[in-house]
């Protein structure tokens, strides 16, 4: 009996030990903040998520800007976008909620707070690289707040990452002035360390990540919105008068205009949100397919408003030799979505070259 009891006791001890270990294991898709920020790769991963969430903001940017301003319209007026078009938007509608922008802000806040702590854990994470990462975080936060303040004027001002339930989730709105001052302060802080890069490895990264040029442009745009025109001109001149070899420059040859649309990331570009449908299925939300007015009303897509379509026709007539605004097969009359590509999608946003007016971009890159 004593022998049996000893065996049972040992078995129980093993079970309790296993149970304790099992309870300490975190879910595979969850990590606590203290366990995450260990290396430079962790910082890069959060920054990448910030850019990814910024790409997810594009449909909101179109809805709040082009759609609300009647540059584009939607034929189905019963949808959330249709209600925005009819000035019938409600706070409960996902199409008018700002949560995706605050996801970008949250990623940026996390990098700003925790990236400096990584230097104590990763000997290869030098201060220069950390400061470079901070400039990108400042840019992402500033750009997100600029979109928010231009559309809502007063929004909650969040500068700390949400890491636990102790953080408040019902924050009062801050004034437009406070938001704009934060953006300008962020840009100044990013530029003060001289860590903002002029280029990254690869064209897509140079145009798709925050560079010194993107920070100048963000500051100029923010000052313009704040009606601080002299400072706006100052930062615009930093771009226009730059002499660095890899600076953004106006195209010297008019015939190169198409490079801005395909393949994109041209020398004239300062910052572009990157899409890669081929390798990463990132085409969702891309604004590449916008139909002209008169397109089949059964499609679930944007179309240019009638005045915008007429303006495109006028420009096409005036500059026919340049074919700047030509659509597929020279038609401005939209047809059913089912017949794509034999329809009137604006060619320069979906074509593949100036000379070849029948080549179609089959992906939304």
Question: What are these regions, as identified by a protein language model?
Answer:
Residues 167-178, 228:
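Structural transition elements
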Residues 41, 47, 80-88, 92-95, ...:
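Elongated scaffold/linker segments in the mid-to-C-terminal portions of large proteins
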Residues 19-66, 236, 256-258:
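Membrane-proximal, proline-rich intrinsically disordered regions
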Residues 21, 58-59, 148-157, 195, ...:
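Proline-centered turn/helix-capping motifs that create local helix->coil transitions or kinks
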Residues 34, 60-78, 158-160, 196-290:
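Short, surface-exposed recognition loops and adjoining beta-strand edges that mediate ligand/DNA contacts
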């Amino acid at each position: 009996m004593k022998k049996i009891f000893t065996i049972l006791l040992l078995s129980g001890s093993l079970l309790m030990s296993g149970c304790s270990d099992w309870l300490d294991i975190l879910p595979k898709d969850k990590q606590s903040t203290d366990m995450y920020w260990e290396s430079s790769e962790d910082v890069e991963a959060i920054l990448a998520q910030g850019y990814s969430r910024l790409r997810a903001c594009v449909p909101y940017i179109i809805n709040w800007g082009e759609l609300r301003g009647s540059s584009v319209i939607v034929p189905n007026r019963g949808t959330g976008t249709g209600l925005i078009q009819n000035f019938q938007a409600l706070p409960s509608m996902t199409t008018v909620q700002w949560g995706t922008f605050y996801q970008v802000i949250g990623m940026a806040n996390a990098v700003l707070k925790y990236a400096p702590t990584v230097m104590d854990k990763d000997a290869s994470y030098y201060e220069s690289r950390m400061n470079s990462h901070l400039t990108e975080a400042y840019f992402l936060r500033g750009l997100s707040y600029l979109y928010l303040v231009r559309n809502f004027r007063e929004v909650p001002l969040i500068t700390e990452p949400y890491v636990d339930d102790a953080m408040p989730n019902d924050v009062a709105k801050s004034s437009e002035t406070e938001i704009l001052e934060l953006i300008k302060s962020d840009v100044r802080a990013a530029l003060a360390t001289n860590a903002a890069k002029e280029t990254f490895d690869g064209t897509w990264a140079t145009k798709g990540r925050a560079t010194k040029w993107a920070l100048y442009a963000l500051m100029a745009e923010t000052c313009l919105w704040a009606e601080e025109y002299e400072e706006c001109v100052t930062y615009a001149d930093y771009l226009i008068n730059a002499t660095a070899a890899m600076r953004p420059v106006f195209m010297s040859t008019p015939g190169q205009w198409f490079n801005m649309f395909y393949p994109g990331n041209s020398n004239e570009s300062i910052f572009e949100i990157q899409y890669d449908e081929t390798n990463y299925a990132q085409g969702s939300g891309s604004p590449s397919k916008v139909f002209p007015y008169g397109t089949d009303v059964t499609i679930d897509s944007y179309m240019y408003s009638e005045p915008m379509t007429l303006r495109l026709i006028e420009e096409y007539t005036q500059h026919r030799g340049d074919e700047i605004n030509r659509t597929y097969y020279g038609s401005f009359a939209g047809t059913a979505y089912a017949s794509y590509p034999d329809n009137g999608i604006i060619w320069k946003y979906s074509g593949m070259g100036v000379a070849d007016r029948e080549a179609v971009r089959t992906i939304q890159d």
